[in-house]
Each structure stands twice: as C-alpha cells, then as structure tokens.
Amino acid sequence: MCIRDRRDTPRHLFLDEAISSRAYEDLALPIGYQQTISQPYVVAKMTEHLISDERLTAIPLKDTLEIGTGCGYQTYLLSIFSKKVTTIERIKPLQEKAKKTLEELKVKNVNFILDDGNGLDNRKYDAILSAAAPLEVPLNLKERLNIGGKLILPVGDSKQQNLIFIKRISKDKYTEEKLEDVLFVPLLKGVVS
C-alpha cells in the first residue's frame, strides 16, 4: 500500500480548526509550541522508507519507535503499518492533544511516553523515525535497531539538514543513505509541562 494513495488519512483532525482548511496542502503547518506538522510529501516519504521491504504483509512492522509525536499525524500513519508504536514527545500539551485525537480515531496500538528521548531503554525496534533533527545521527538510536531494522531522521543544524535513511545489516554494520535536503525542528533536551 502506497502512503501517497491514503487519501482517507484525516490530516485536518490533527490541526487547530483555524488552519484545518489548509490540511491537504503539501506544506508544513504550525501546531503550537514552535512545532510544526510536516508536509504530507515528507511524512509519506519517511513512512514508505520504513515499510519499503515489507509491503506484502498485512502489518509489516512489529515494533516502531517515533521520536517527536507532535500532533500525532505521523504516529497515526505508523500505527497503520505497525503492530505497536512507542511515541515520545517532550511537550506535554502536544502529547495530550495527540493522544486525544488518536483515541477519537480508535487507535489502540500506540504507547505514549513523555520524555526527550535521550534516555532510551535497551528495547530494540524494527523501525525508528525521528521528527526532530539532531546535529548528527545518535549512536543510541542506531543501537536500538533490530538487525534488518531501519532508522529515518533529519540530521543537521537550523540552516542545513539532510534526511538520512539507515538500515542495520548486522551487529556492527549499517548502511546509510542521504535522501534529500529537509528542514525540521531541532531535537532538544528537556520536558515541557
């Protein structure tokens, strides 16, 4: 199933009513707290890279980690293609709003964690997606991948970022591919209540 063909994905439900009329334009929109919902093209590209090898199975990913829940739109898409999604958000009001929206959509396979993602446990994941940009690829994220697992994230500073796709080949070997230039919010430390 191609993400770009999911016209039934209710992006407007994840936005404030004042800008919901722009929900289906291919652009990033503000969601408050100096955060944005990514443009649909980028959301689709990131999700498709995570599920690219597994499209023939009903639910391709067993365990997915998302860093930066934001409004929950990307979380919603990940929940369609994953048995279980763990999503981390550092801004409590955003997390609460995303949780409410996903509950209204009857999404039941998402676990919400209020944290900045810096103190990850040792759990392994089939897929990891970060919606915030660190300055470089964090080693702790690569180490959280199962063998065959995939990581996609923006990397760089506020002026120049690249969308990076990483696949874990073996215990100590990874492939890394630069996909395109992007602009995401930075990955920050600390929790905002």
Where do the language-model regions lie?
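Substrate-binding/catalytic lobe of Class I Rossmann-like enzymes that use SAM or dcSAM, i.e.
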Residues: L163-K171, E176-S193
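Conserved alpha-helix/loop element of class I SAM-dependent methyltransferases that forms part
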Residues: A23-D26, I37-L61
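Glycine-rich beta-alpha junction loops
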Residues: P10, D157-K159, V182-L183
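Amphipathic alpha-helical segments that form the core helices of the histone-fold
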Residues: R7-F14
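Conserved nucleotide-cofactor-binding alpha/beta core module
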Residues: H49-Y174
